[in-house]
Amino acid sequence: GTDKDPRTCENYMDLWVAEMDKNGNWKAPVLIDGEGINTEDNEGTVAFDGRGKTMFFTRCPNVKKQNLGCEIWVSESKGKNKWGTPKKLELKPHDSLTVGHPCVSEDGRFLIFASDLPGGFGGLDLWATTYERKSDSWTTPVNLGPEINTSGNDAFPTFAKNGDLFYATDGKPGIGGLDIFRAAKQGEENKWSNPVNMGSPINSLNNDYALVEHTDRTGYFTSERKSQNGENKPDIYKYEIPPYVFDLKVIVTDLNEKNVKIADAKVVVTDNNGGTWEG
């Protein structure tokens, strides 16, 4: 949009697309191509299904420059970077001012979102709903529970490659403002627990949120930390987890005769994520 958002004193947000060239450099962003996607309202916080064919995004309407909460809208792909007219996601019951920050499963049938729906633990909570093909509707939202949600704001959920859940919260002990946490997936069920703060340098003294994995060791997130020009406005940052480097000396002995070393024994080391090293 062209008007100024009174909360941020910045222009209302639109959705943009940037492509990476063959050298790994980002091209200049362009407005997303789709009738009715970008409006005079705020549009942001996008999620796609695994095929990239369905797009969920947040829209925060304003009438006479008065913000009226947020909604989730859905659009279907019409070809490369082209999108169809979006439809509002209908949730039942929907007794909430704010519904946004969609996070969708690979098959597009399981959705986590942030909302101030009644029955939460305070502020924004994370809720889940499942698409039922037979009725062509979404089930009544279920709160993710007190292990994930807090009395503060819990928002910006995304899925890790292994099914873990990233999200931002200001309701748990952290470094400052919204911090990014990672909660472990529990078996095959849609449950997560044991959220762990991602720590520095991903989290800062300011708000950090919306982490998206690219690979299991690289990704992107938004941060309001002080930039090179001295401003604390939201910017996108890239992170990379360095490879594990360690020296390990192992001596293998006979179980019955401990002083007898076994030559050329095969040793396998396994980490908590299932990675293995052989030597």
What are these regions (language model features)?
Residues 1-251, 255-261, 266-268, 275-278:
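Short, conserved micro-motifs composed of acidic
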